[in-house]
Amino acid sequence: MSSTKKDIKVYVNYRDEYAEPKIISALKNSGKELTFTNSAKEANFQWAQYEDIDFDEVYKNPKTKLCCSYVIRKALIRKEYLWRTVITYLAKHPDSILSKSVPEAYSLELDYAEFLDDSLMEAYELRQELEENATKNISEKQWYILKPSMCDRAQGIRLFSTIEELQAIFDSFDDEESESEEAGLEEKGDITVAFNNKIVISQIRNFLVQKYISKPLLLDHRKFHIRAYVLATGALSVYLFNEMLCLLARDKYKKPTPDPDLLFSHLSNTCLQGDNVEQSSIRDFWNTSIENKDDIFKSILNIIGDVFEAAATTQGIHFQPLENCFEIFGVDFLVDCESQVYLLEVNSYPDFKQTGKNLSNIIENLFSAVVETAIIPFFESSTKRNVDSKLTLAKKLQLFGFR
């Protein structure tokens, strides 16, 4: 599994002015003899953006070359794939913690707003619930949250409770596409995103509709989610980083409405708050006033263990961990007023700079833990794997080939 060479050629190209210096510092403090190179092909170890990794070299050299990302993992990071992963796993493991910790969801597929009715015919249970909502008082309605499958940073997320409200959301997205030559648009990989947080339907196609958790736990009257960092190594050990963040919505919490102007009280993605995020919006989980923190941490640990096992054992085409790869995932959780923990989503290449300056030591500690646990052991002659004290094992599996 290891290289006998003392000198390790390292290729770092993270293209993030917040994270990359911390990555390099963690590597230099590893105690290993390193030579930094500009060639991914020549490197023994690649810590770079996904599109900059030479995966051919990773495949050809499973014992001597390591990289910071799995090649295939959409069973976890695509929203509708994650939902399928969970329901497939629960069919065989109905007693899993995932049965109560993943909000019920429905998948919609459409190219244009005019095809919503056809898509709802497939999701007939959702359609029935939305029709029932139309006859209820606003206080009695079940609310839903619409999430474009391939978008991140909260792009395109909306709240709704009826078919009419959902149709209006998709109509507004279609309007954005027709006005794209006049409006300012930004390219996000293969996805075009408007600066007003709208998206172009035809470039997305797949959407996930989740039941909205209507009674979230609040901090200072503001909704928040927990950002946990997860390290997956080889095939397959999964660790939860002990230091977690609470990311707070900009505005005080209000009851759900379809008004997009009130989204800032419901969406706790701090990236929506611009470059000058208030430090009060980003907090160290362990230093908050949240009760039952140990129980919440344990629930998160168990959820992570089961969801990675679900992907690894039921989605062999869409999650293929390799022994000479590791990856850091940003996993988001919501806690309700009864301390029930819900899994929201799994993110590849999480936006570390959301942590900000005041809590940057958390990211520094994370990278140090990754170096100690995922990188140094790979290049050591000993088969013993060191595990940093800031990591807690969530799941260990032995996977060989396709499942």
Curated annotation (Swiss-Prot):
PROSITE patterns, per database record: TTL
UniProt entry keywords in alphabetical sequence: Cytoplasm, Ligase, Magnesium, Nucleus, Potassium
Cofactors that this protein relies on: Mg(2+); K(+)
GO CC annotation terms, alphabetical: cytosol; nucleus; P-body
Keyword Cell inner membrane appears in the UniProt entry: no
Signal peptide (residue range): none
Cited InterPro entries: TTL, TTL/TTLL_fam
Gene Ontology terms describing biological process: protein modification process
Residues of the TTL domain: 9-386
Major enzyme class: ligase
Reaction catalyzed: C-terminal L-alpha-aminoacyl-L-glutamyl-L-glutamyl-[tubulin] + L-tyrosine + ATP = C-terminal L-alpha-aminoacyl-L-glutamyl-L-glutamyl-L-tyrosyl-[tubulin] + ADP + phosphate + H(+)
Function: Probable tubulin--tyrosine ligase.
PANTHER family documented for this protein: TUBULIN--TYROSINE LIGASE PBY1-RELATED (PTHR47551:SF1)
UniProt record similarity statement: Belongs to the tubulin--tyrosine ligase family.
Protein's UniProt name: Probable tubulin--tyrosine ligase C12B10.04
Lineage of the species this protein comes from: Eukaryota, Fungi, Dikarya, Ascomycota, Taphrinomycotina
